[in-house]
Regions:
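Acidic helix/loop microenvironments that form the catalytic cleft of cell-wall polysaccharide enzymes
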Residues: 49-52, 141-168
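Surface-exposed patches in mature extracellular/periplasmic domains of secreted proteins
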Residues: 35-45, 58-62, 138-154
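Extracellular low-complexity, O-glycosylation-prone Ser/Thr/Pro/Gly-rich "stalks"
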Residues: 160-183
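Peptidoglycan-targeting cell-wall enzymes and recognition modules
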Residues: 2-21, 26, 45-132
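Conserved aromatic-histidine-acidic binding/catalytic patches
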Residues: 15, 33-37, 81, 115-118, ...
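Secretory-pathway/luminal and periplasmic proteins that interact with or process carbohydrate-rich
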Residues: 17, 34, 51-61, 137, ...
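Amphipathic alpha-helical segments within well-ordered protein domains
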Residues: 9, 28-32, 128, 159, ...
Length: 183
């Protein structure tokens, strides 16, 4: 299916068209490549992207990354890994282990050049990869279960996987409703 410029603007009303135009083709290619191709999948994916990236404003986590220093659960085993492998991409890929897994998947050396995830192709493709495989499960399967009556439960479960908790749930809920209306 894919998302149009006007649909993306309805989902992310604060994103200027210049930003939408910068990412739209990359976003559609990534969604197609990773099977994010139904209304439900697109809506849940774009809601997470909208929140995590502040409507495509950020492709790199604003925080320093110090809170990830020494986090073995993220594979951060070398001094400086916390800052080096802080969240990047539209769905913040975080930690040496996740960067390494994405490198093995895509073939781009994002371990040596983490900033590749800040570029349009890296930001969109890594987000789609994380949503469908990189998080350890395919969140499209959860999105497929959204029948309109269980939307809140599906949203909460997807958010827990993407975020590790329910941070920003109200925002994600608004984006999801906009996406469902726009698509």
């Amino acid at each position: 299916m894919g998302v149009t410029r006007s649909q993306l603007k309805k989902i992310m009303p604060n994103a200027p068209y210049v930003r939408i135009d910068k990412y739209l083709d990359y976003l559609n290619k990534a969604m197609q490549e990773f099977g994010i191709i139904t209304k439900e999948r697109e809506a849940h994916f774009l809601a997470q992207v909208a929140h995590e990236s502040a409507e495509m404003r950020y492709t790199r986590e604003l925080a320093s990354g110090d809170k990830y220093e020494g986090r073995k659960d993220l594979g951060n085993i070398q001094k400086g890994d916390g800052r080096r492998f802080k969240g990047r991409g539209f769905i913040q890929v975080t930690g040496r282990a996740n960067y390494t897994r994405y490198k093995l998947f895509c073939g781009y050396d994002v371990v040596s050049k983490p900033e590749l995830l800040e570029l349009p192709r890296g930001a969109t493709r890594s987000a789609a990869w994380f949503f469908t495989a990189g998080c350890g499960q395919n969140l499209c399967i959860l999105a497929d279960l959204d029948n309109g009556r269980n939307t809140e439960l599906i949203l909460q479960n997807i958010t827990k996987v993407v975020n590790g908790g329910l941070n920003g749930l109200d925002s994600r809920r608004r984006y999801l409703q906009r996406a469902k209306n726009a698509l």
